[in-house]
């Protein structure tokens, strides 16, 4: 506590800041009983002081100060603090902390007019309602540089602490001044600005005045003057406050690197423009109106055409017109002066006053209704003329635009009539808009004036927001203000209670989390979250028919009863109507919603706006131009692009945007809180209402803040910082010369200091202190430093005195010597012999001439020798001098290059600032776009509700349809039962008819099942289609962001090229300067060379000196003259020498710089100094010798004088060059300092921008997620509605079709019954004929042998086809079952995946938000650590001894940064995983879409097949009638055909053996592939994330293969159905075989297509293999991600197992397809035999077989590729190895069979060599086997030719039917081709989309990498600039010390 003497510096403010010593002593000596002195609860006063009299049974009886005796419970009694704590400055120091103690401490301090009190970490101030002398200049000076504990509580102390934190922590600061309206926020804001403007004034006022040009005041004056101007136009009187800020402002004061004031800017929020046209009774409008009418400046009254009576103007006279505490006349002069100081031009100043006057005139405009019309018309034009005059408009045009505005309808404009009320509303809207835009324009102009373009490093922001206030009539503006205060209170709570405790947990300190119950999230979410009040308001604004009532109904429907903070208002008598109530932190507020929709939309008369834009008043035209609109919406002074294009932005949306930006700014700074309190409602000085103050304390969290300050550790410091700063307290605790960890060093240091060791804790990276301990350590450090400095001063003074004493002794000895000689001379002066000596001595001069000549000759020889030696030394020194000069030039070049680099860096900094501004604009656009989407979402949500109502109605219709459908189903089942009974009756008929009937029934059931499946799949596909559109929209957004990034990169590239060009120009100019300098150096060398020549000439002349000795006497007089000239020359030489010494000092400075870099040239400098001294001595000797010999060189005097003059001129030139270089040097130093500070500012701004970008990106992603969810719901409802409509029509149509089908089946049943009876009768007749012809058959057996064999062969083929058909039917059923189960399963999995994705996205968003907050704190830590590292590097250069320890500390810091950076990368990886999961869902969407389209095609195919079957039934009925005639003949040859069947069976087995042989080959290849796979699998395990995409691509290929196989199955089914028609007749079977051959060719073509797709798959696989090499480089990063991706890998493995099952099914289907291909090959051999018989061209058959063989080989290659593809997708190697082992065993069993087949293949190879040896060599085992079969079949076919001739007639009859069948097959083939085309198209689209996504992702990563590199380069440049700055300062210091 300071003494009275120490408090004297505060002047007259001392009594208002701290108690006097006398009061403190009295308080300590005051009697006090701790047990009896208490506070008790009181109904009126809340708490009163009392004395305990007794305690009984939980009750306490006490006597109050008023003399009353009360009895209360124990929990209503609170202990009183001792008297020494009365009026304590920091309430956290109280012994007993509770509400009454805090209340009475504030009350007692307030009674003593001590309005500022510390409350833990923040400050509380109470409004005194009177002027106190606590803000005088001496108070500002007293608080400057003082620590918090050294001075009394004050707003200046808070400001100075923020200023010091900014300089030491290198972090932006903010001061949040909060409180209710009237608590004194605005006054404290002004005092903060006053303090900064006083202590941090700019350094060079002259320079500022020179650069400011038209600026009429200094920057400090302008910052201070901004407040009066803004208060005049933005402050007004309210019920609770005479000077209430009706807008919010965030003032940022920027400082340079040295803490000097650099610039400032102001952001404003939500001006209450409704006050312009409406005020309550106890309030008034903005001050400016009443200031103008105060008549202080009569010229304004005249210019504005107004009066001095406010009641003459309706807009400003609805409430009070005067305020006792405000002098409007003085305020007008202050406002007018502020306008001048802030640099507004005269025209702008006049425009401001004119627009203000126009607003007042607008309120007096009158309108009336036309007779018999609702149209309004002007009621007089005088007022309109005045308003038009002030705004430079035509009054007639203005009135016309108001009464008859033009409205755009479509593409045309029409004139609209207005009622009187509409005109008044339009005038009011225009007045409010004009005033608001003018206010925002003024803020913009102020910011332009305050932006001095000086380098700025950090800023301190001061927040002054309109306070929480409860009016009788609360509107939308009041809701916004209260919501802002709610958010700020939540920010305070989160910072004070949540972040503080999270810091303890993170640092590992034992701490139990305390929930203070201060979370305001419920109220905030009620207002701002989706479907909150703002959301509903904006949604209603989009509906043209929305009203206030509909808005209120939606609010009640959405929130009443669901949220405790939303209540119905309780009507009160005498108060305005209210529609809903909100429970805020500071009280419950009733809100009236009348006019909210119009206020939020803020409509303007566009016709009048058009007039404004053309106004002759330039300021008005600018206000309503497009550019100003953008600026106005930017929140005052912040430049930004145009907001939302053609759409509009509501007031609430703009307010939320500005508020979010404010909260982002605050989160990026270190906040300091100042809590302003209202003492009473009556504005009475000194009075305090207890309940009011307690309510504010509770709401503001004051008590909780004190508690956490007392319990927690509010002070914390990094271990390295603590070690560096406090090591001086006990240096012996930390051993020197050995490394010790900073944490251990801190622990040892604290353990060795005499302090309370319970007052601190050690965290992981910091040491934490209780409140006050750090101040104690600071005091101890100051004392220790004082001791050390005292000792140092004593040692220095002793040394200096010893040096002085030594000099005194030397002078004493010299004086003694002189005195002795003088005394001796005085003794002999009168001696006669001495007198004679004096007389004779001059006469002996001539006699002694010869001696003198001899002496002179000797002297001459000595001088000559000395001259030679000196000349040699001079040359040597000149060479060294040249070398040093060269070194100096090199160093100067280096300095110049560094200066150029710094200039380049400055230009880059400027460009980065511009880029930052552009990025901020883009961020604004993105935010606005996101808000647009939110608005659209809100609109769509409303539509969703309507659709839900419609859906409920449609559901009722669906229920009715379902009932009808159930009836139809019953009828259908009954019909199916009848058909089943008929089928059972027909079971005894012929086998062929039974099979046909079963097939027909199966197809009907499949048809019905397919229809049902189709309906179910349509629903699923609709859902998936919506997901696809959502993903496509996301891809579009990514592409848009990518385009923006490309544009930004192009801009940066252009800026880079421009900077490089500027750099080249600067380098060229530098080179020119260097060339000039080198030329001057060369001239100097030339002159020095001439001097050496002169010296040599002098030597020559000295030889002539002997001859000229006779002339010495004559020249002695001349010598005296020359001596005078020589003296002058010596003076000039001395001057040149001084200049040379200056150059030497420059050289020494540069050498010192080198010494700082390397520390190796100090010895050289000392040697140079010695040599320089020797050189000076020699030169002096040389000059003396020269002067002696100049007596003999009179002839050369003139030349010598000329040369000296010339050298003098050169020296003057050099002096001028030196001065120029000195000037450039000083300028470069200044530029270096500026650049350093600028670089620091840019780096900080860049960090803030990155934080802002990340925050906005998170917000954007959250908004997009919400938007997509809403869009998906709406699309689902729309599609469901459309689907239900179509379903109802489809059901009706299907019902009609089923009825027709039932009737048709009934008719077919009757016809079949008749046909069966007829066939039975025919069968009996044929049986009789058979018995009669049995004998004839035996006699003709020999002739029919061949026919029997042929029949058996064909019968076998028929049986094979029947088996294949049955197998195909079973496969169809299997595929259908699988499709249904897979579809259902996939749908369920998709739904589950979607839920998981939504949950994970939500978790990811929460995690990202948490990580962002961590990143923000880490960014601050990183910046602080980086700056500290720079300081440490400076310490390293100063002290090499501590280098090792500091390097280790630097590495520790780097590790911490790397760990946090890794965490950041891991978080980013999680986000990427979420994106990839989204992409996997998109692939599932494509799969289901393909399946859906296939099912549609199957439905169409089945419909056509149904029609064809009906046609076939009729055809078969006719054929059966004919077939009955041939049954008898077929029975005859049955035995022959059975024999042929056995032969065909044998050949089939041989073909199967060959196929198994080929499969053995495939298995061997598979083993090899498994080996390769085992090698690749290791790499794949490390790259699950990248290969997952490839797996999806391959899965789509397999699915396309499956669709192709399905098409093949359908085509084979068609072929089988065609063949069944031919079963009754042998000729028909032959033609059917021919048809089957064509079908086989088509199947082969399908296989070719499949092979093509497999080739594409192989290409993708090759690309993947090549990409593996690239992926190796990413191995390290993937390993770090492996742990985080483990959960995703588990899920992917589940999907991989499903994929594996699908692959196995595909492989099985592939084997089945191979078997069916083999079967088709067998049929083809029969077809080829028939062709040979018909065409007799074996060579053509061989060619065709070669083609077939080639296709078979391609099929083989396809199998290989499919296996390779499957191997790439495989994850579980053991299953594959087991399969390989099993196949290996099969291979060994089949080796013997292969050997037998090899013999046959050799024979076939010899036969095939005739047709072409080269092709036969390429054929493999299966081809050889097929050729052997061809040869065997040829032999049998030659024998069967005879039988075929007998059947030629029947072939001709069946040709027509074959042609019909061929047409059917062609149609089916066309359908298959179309399906395959669709599959390929979908596949290509999917691949293109994936490729595009990958390309975008790669580009994004590349851009991110480049951004990181740019950041690193900026950091490096910043560190270099700081080093240069430090070096420059040290050099400057040394120069000063040397001078």
Swiss-Prot record:
Q: Which gene encodes it?
A: Myh4
Q: Name one GO biological process term.
A: muscle contraction
- Name the CDD domains for this protein: MYSc_Myh4 (cd14915)
State the protein's name: Myosin-4
Does the keyword Nucleotide-binding belong to this entry? yes
* Phosphotyrosine carried by residues: 389, 424, 1464, 1492
Main localization (coarse): cytoplasm
Q: Provide a GO CC annotation, any one.
A: myosin filament
Which residues belong to any copy of the Myosin N-terminal SH3-like domain? 33-82
Keywords in UniProt for this one? Actin-binding, ATP-binding, Calmodulin-binding, Coiled coil, Cytoplasm, Methylation, Motor protein, Muscle protein, Myosin, Nucleotide-binding, Phosphoprotein, Thick filament
Free-text comment about domains: The rodlike tail sequence is highly repetitive, showing cycles of a 28-residue repeat pattern composed of 4 heptapeptides, characteristic for alpha-helical coiled coils. Limited proteolysis of myosin heavy chain produces 1 light meromyosin (LMM) and 1 heavy meromyosin (HMM). HMM can be further cleaved into 2 globular subfragments (S1) and 1 rod-shaped subfragment (S2).
Locate the IQ domain: which residues?
Answer: 785-814
What SUPFAM superfamilies would the database entry show? Answer: Myosin rod fragments, P-loop containing nucleoside triphosphate hydrolases, Tropomyosin
Q: Which residues carry this modification: Phosphothreonine?
A: 64, 69, 391, 419, 776, 1241, 1255, 1265, 1286, 1467, 1501, 1517, 1730, 1736
Task: Using the UniProt annotation, give all residue ranges assigned to the region (Actin-binding).
Answer: 659-681, 761-775
Protein's cellular compartments: Cytoplasm, Myofibril
InterPro entries the UniProt entry points to? Kinesin_motor_dom_sf (IPR036961), Myosin_head_motor_dom-like (IPR001609), Myosin_N (IPR004009), Myosin_S1_N (IPR008989), Myosin_tail (IPR002928), P-loop_NTPase (IPR027417), XRCC4-like_C (IPR014751)
This chain's source organism reads: Mus musculus
């Amino acid at each position: 506590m300071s003494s009275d003497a120490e408090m004297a510096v505060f002047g007259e403010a001392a009594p208002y800041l701290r108690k006097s010593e006398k009061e403190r002593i009295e308080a300590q000596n005051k009697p006090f009983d701790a047990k009896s002195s208490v506070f008790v609860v009181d109904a009126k006063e809340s708490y009163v002081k009392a004395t305990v009299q007794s305690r009984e049974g939980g009750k306490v009886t006490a006597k109050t100060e008023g003399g009353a005796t009360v009895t209360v419970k124990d929990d209503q009694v609170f202990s009183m603090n001792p008297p020494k704590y009365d009026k304590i400055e920091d309430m956290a120091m109280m012994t007993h902390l509770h509400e009454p103690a805090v209340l009475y401490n504030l009350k007692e301090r307030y009674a003593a007019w001590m309005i500022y009190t510390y409350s833990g970490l923040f400050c509380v101030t109470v409004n005194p309602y009177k002027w106190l002398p606590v803000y005088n200049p001496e108070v500002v000076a007293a608080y400057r540089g003082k620590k918090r504990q050294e001075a009394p509580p004050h707003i200046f102390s808070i400001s100075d602490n923020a200023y010091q934190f900014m300089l030491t922590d290198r972090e932006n600061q903010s001061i949040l001044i909060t409180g209710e309206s009237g608590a004194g926020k605005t006054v404290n804001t002004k005092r903060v600005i006053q303090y900064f403007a006083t202590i941090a004034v700019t350094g060079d006022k002259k320079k500022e005045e020179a650069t400011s040009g038209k600026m009429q005041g200094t920057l400090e004056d302008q910052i201070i003057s901004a407040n009066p101007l803004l208060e005049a136009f933005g402050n007004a009187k309210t019920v609770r406050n005479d000077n209430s800020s009706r807008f919010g402002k965030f003032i940022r004061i920027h400082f340079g690197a040295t803490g000097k004031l650099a610039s400032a800017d102001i952001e404003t929020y939500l001006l209450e423009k409704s006050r312009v046209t409406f005020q309550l009774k106890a309030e008034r409008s903005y001050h400016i109106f009443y200031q103008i009418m105060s008549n202080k400046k009569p010229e304004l009254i005249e210019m504005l055409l107004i009066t001095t009576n406010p009641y003459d103007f309706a807009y400003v006279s609805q409430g009070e017109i005067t305020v006792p505490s405000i002098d409007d006349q003085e305020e007008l002069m202050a406002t007018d002066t502020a306008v001048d100081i802030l640099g507004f031009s005269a025209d702008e100043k006049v425009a401001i006053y004119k627009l203000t006057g126009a607003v007042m005139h607008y309120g007096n405009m009158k309108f009336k209704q036309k007779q018999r019309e609702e149209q309004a018309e002007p009621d007089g034009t005088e007022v309109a003329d005045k308003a038009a005059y002030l705004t430079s408009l035509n009054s007639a045009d203005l009135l016309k635009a108001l009464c008859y505005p033009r409205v755009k309808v479509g593409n045309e404009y029409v004139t609209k009539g207005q009622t009187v009320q509409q005109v008044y509303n339009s005038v009011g809207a225009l007045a409010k808009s004009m005033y608001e835009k003018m206010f925002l324009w003024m803020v913009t102009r102020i910011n332009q004036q305050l932006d001095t373009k000086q380098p700025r490093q950090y800023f301190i922001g001061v927040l002054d927001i309109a306070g929480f206030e409860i009016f009788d009539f609360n509107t939308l503006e009041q809701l916004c203000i209260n919501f802002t205060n709610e958010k700020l209170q939540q920010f305070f709570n989160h910072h004070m209670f949540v972040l503080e405790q999270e810091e303890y947990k993170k640092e590992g300190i034992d701490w139990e989390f305390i929930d203070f119950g201060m979370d305001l999230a419920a109220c905030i979410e009620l207002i701002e979250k989706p479907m909150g009040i703002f959301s509903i308001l904006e949604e209603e604004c989009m509906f043209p028919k929305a009203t206030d009532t509909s808005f209120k109904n939606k609010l009640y429907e959405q929130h009443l009863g669901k949220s405790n903070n939303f209540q119905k208002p309780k009507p009160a008598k005498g108060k305005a109507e209210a529609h809903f109530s909100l429970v805020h932190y500071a009280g419950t507020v009733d809100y009236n919603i009348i006019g909210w929709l119009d206020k939020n939309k803020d409509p303007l008369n566009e016709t009048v706006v058009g007039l404004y834009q053309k106004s002759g008043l330039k300021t008005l035209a600018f206000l309503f131009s497009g550019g100003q609109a953008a600026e106005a919406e930017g929140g005052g002074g912040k430049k930004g692009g145009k907001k939302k294009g053609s759409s509009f932005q509501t007031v609430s949306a703009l307010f939320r945007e500005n508020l979010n930006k404010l909260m982002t700014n605050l989160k990026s700074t270190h906040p300091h809180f100042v809590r302003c309190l209202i003492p009473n409602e009556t504005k009475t000085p000194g009075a305090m209402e207890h309940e009011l103050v307690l309510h504010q304390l509770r709401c503001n969290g004051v008590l909780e803040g004190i508690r956490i300050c007392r319990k927690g550790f509010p002070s914390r410091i990094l271990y390295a910082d603590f070690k560096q700063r406090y090591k001086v307290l006990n240096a012996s605790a930390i051993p020197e010369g050995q490394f010790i960890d900073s944490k251990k060093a801190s622990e040892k240091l604290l353990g060795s200091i005499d302090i309370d060791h319970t007052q601190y804790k050690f965290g992981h990276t910091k040491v934490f202190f209780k409140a006050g301990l750090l101040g104690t350590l600071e005091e101890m450090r100051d004392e220790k430093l004082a001791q050390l400095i005292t000792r140092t001063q004593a040692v220095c003074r002793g040394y200096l005195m010893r040096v002085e004493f030594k000099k005194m002794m030397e002078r004493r000895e010299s004086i003694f010597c002189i005195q002795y000689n003088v005394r001796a001379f005085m003794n002999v002066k009168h001696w006669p012999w001495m007198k004679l000596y004096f007389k004779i001595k001059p006469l002996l001069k001539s006699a002694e001439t010869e001696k003198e000549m001899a002496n002179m000759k000797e002297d001459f020889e000595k001088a000559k020798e000395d001259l030679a030696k000196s000349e040699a030394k001079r040359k040597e020194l000149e060479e060294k001098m040249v070398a040093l000069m060269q070194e100096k030039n090199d160093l100067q070049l280096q300095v110049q290059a560094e200066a150029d680099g710094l200039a380049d860096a400055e230009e880059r900094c400027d460009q980065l600032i511009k880029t930052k501004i552009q990025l901020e604009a883009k961020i604004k656009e993105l935010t606005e776009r996101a808000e647009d989407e939110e608005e659209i979402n809100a609109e769509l949500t409303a539509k969703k509700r309507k659709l839900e109502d419609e859906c409920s109605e449609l559901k009722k219709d669906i229920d009715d349809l379902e009932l009808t459908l159930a009836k139809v189903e019953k009828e259908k089942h009954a019909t199916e039962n009848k058909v089943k009974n008929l089928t059972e009756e027909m079971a005894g008929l012929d086998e062929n008819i039974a099979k046909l009937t079963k097939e027909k029934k199966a197809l009907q059931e499949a048809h019905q099942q397919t229809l049902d499946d189709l309906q179910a799949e349509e629903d699923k596909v609709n859902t998936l289609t919506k997901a696809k559109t959502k993903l496509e929209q996301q891809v579009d957004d990514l592409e848009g962001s990518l385009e923006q990034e490309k544009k930004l990169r192009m801009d940066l590239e252009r800026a880079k090229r421009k900077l490089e060009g500027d750099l080249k120009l600067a380098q060229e100019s530098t080179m020119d300067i260097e060339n000039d300098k080198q030329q001057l150096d060369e001239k100097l060398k030339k002159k020095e060379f001439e001097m050496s020549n002169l010296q040599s000439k002098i030597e020559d002349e000295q030889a002539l000196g002997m001859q000229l000795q006779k002339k010495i006497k004559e020249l002695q007089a001349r010598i005296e003259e020359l001596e005078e000239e020589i003296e002058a020359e010596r003076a000039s030489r001395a001057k040149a020498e001084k200049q040379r010494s200056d150059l030497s000092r420059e050289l020494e400075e540069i050498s010192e710089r080198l010494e700082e870099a390397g520390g190796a040239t100090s010895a050289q400098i000392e040697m140079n100094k010695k040599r320089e001294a020797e050189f000076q001595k020699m030169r002096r000797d040389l000059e003396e010798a020269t002067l002696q010999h100049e007596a003999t060189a009179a002839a050369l005097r003139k030349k010598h004088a000329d040369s000296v003059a010339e050298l003098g001129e050169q020296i003057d030139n050099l002096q001028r060059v030196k001065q120029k270089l000195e000037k450039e040097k000083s300028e470069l130093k200044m530029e270096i300092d500026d650049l350093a500070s600028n670089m620091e500012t840019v780096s900080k701004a860049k960090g803030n921008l990155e934080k802002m970008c990340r925050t906005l990106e998170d917000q954007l992603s959250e908004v997009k997620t919400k938007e997509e969810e809403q869009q998906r719901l709406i699309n689902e409802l729309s599609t469901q509605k459309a689907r239900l409509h179509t379903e109802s029509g489809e059901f009706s149509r299907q019902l009609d079709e089923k009825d027709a089908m039932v009737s048709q089946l009934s008719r077919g049943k009757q016809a079949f019954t008749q046909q069966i009876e007829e066939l039975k009768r025919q069968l009996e007749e044929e049986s009789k004929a058979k018995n009669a012809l049995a004998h004839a058959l035996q006699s003709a057996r020999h002739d029919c042998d061949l026919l029997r064999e042929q029949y058996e062969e064909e019968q076998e083929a028929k049986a094979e086809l029947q088996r294949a058909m049955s197998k195909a039917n079973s496969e169809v059923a299997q595929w259908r079952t699988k499709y249904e189960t897979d579809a259902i399963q996939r749908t369920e999995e998709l739904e589950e995946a979607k839920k998981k994705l939504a949950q994970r996205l939500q978790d990811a968003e929460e995690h990202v938000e948490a990580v962002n907050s961590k990143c923000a704190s880490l960014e601050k830590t990183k910046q602080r650590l980086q700056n500290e590292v720079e300081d440490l590097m400076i310490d390293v250069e100063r002290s090499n001894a501590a280098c090792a320890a500091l390097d280790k500390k630097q590495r520790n810091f780097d590790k911490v940064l790397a760990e946090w950076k890794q965490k950041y990368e891991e978080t980013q990886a999680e986000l990427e995983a979420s994106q990839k999961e989204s992409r996997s869902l998109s692939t599932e969407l494509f799969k289901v879409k393909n399946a859906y389209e296939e099912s549609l095609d199957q439905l169409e195919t089945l419909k056509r097949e149904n029609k064809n079957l009906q046609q076939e039934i009729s055809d078969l009925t006719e054929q059966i009638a004919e077939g009955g005639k041939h049954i008898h003949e077929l029975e005859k040859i049955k035995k022959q055909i059975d024999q042929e069947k056995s032969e065909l069976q044998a050949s089939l087995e041989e073909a199967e053996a060959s196929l198994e042989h080929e499969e053995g080959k495939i298995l061997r290849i598979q083993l090899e592939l498994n080996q390769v796979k085992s090698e690749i699998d290791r790499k794949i395990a490390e790259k699950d994330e990248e290969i997952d995409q490839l797996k999806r691509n391959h899965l789509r290929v397999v699915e396309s293969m499956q669709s192709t196989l399905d098409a093949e199955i359908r085509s084979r089914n068609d072929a089988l159905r065609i063949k069944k028609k031919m079963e009754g007749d042998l000729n028909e079977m032959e033609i059917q075989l021919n048809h089957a051959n064509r079908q086989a060719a088509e199947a082969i073509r399908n296989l070719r297509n499949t092979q093509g797709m497999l080739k594409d798959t192989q290409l993708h696989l090759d690309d993947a293999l090549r990409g593996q090499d690239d992926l190796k480089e990413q191995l390290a990063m993937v390993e770090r991600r492996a742990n985080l991706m483990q959960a995703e890998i588990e899920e992917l493995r589940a999907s991989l197992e499903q994929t594996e099952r699908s692959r196995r099914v595909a492989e099985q289907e592939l084997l089945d397809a191979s078997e069916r291909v083999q079967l088709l090959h067998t049929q083809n051999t029969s077809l080829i035999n028939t062709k040979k018989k018909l065409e007799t061209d074996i060579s053509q058959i061989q060619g065709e077989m070669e083609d077939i063989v080639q296709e078979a080989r391609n099929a083989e290659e396809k199998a290989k590729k499919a296996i390779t593809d499957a191997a790439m997708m495989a994850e579980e190697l053991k299953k594959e190895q087991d399969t390989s082992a099993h196949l290996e065993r099969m291979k060994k069993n089949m080796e013997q069979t292969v050997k037998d087949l090899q013999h046959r293949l050799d024979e076939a190879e010899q036969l095939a060599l005739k047709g072409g040896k080269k092709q036969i060599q390429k054929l493999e085992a299966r081809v050889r086997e097929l050729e052997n079969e061809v040869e065997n079949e040829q032999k049998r076919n030659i024998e069967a030719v005879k039988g075929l001739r007998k059947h030629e007639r029947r072939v001709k009859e069946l040709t027509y039917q074959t042609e019909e069948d061929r047409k059917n097959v062609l149609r089916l083939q066309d359908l298959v081709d179309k399906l395959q085309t669709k599959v390929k198209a979908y596949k290509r689209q999917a691949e293109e989309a994936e490729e595009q996504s990958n390309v975008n992702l790669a580009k994004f990563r590349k851009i991110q990498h480049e951004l990181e590199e740019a950041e690193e380069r900026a950091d490096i440049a910043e560190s270099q600039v700081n080093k240069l700055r430090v070096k420059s300062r040290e050099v400057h210091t040394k120069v000063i010390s040397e001078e």
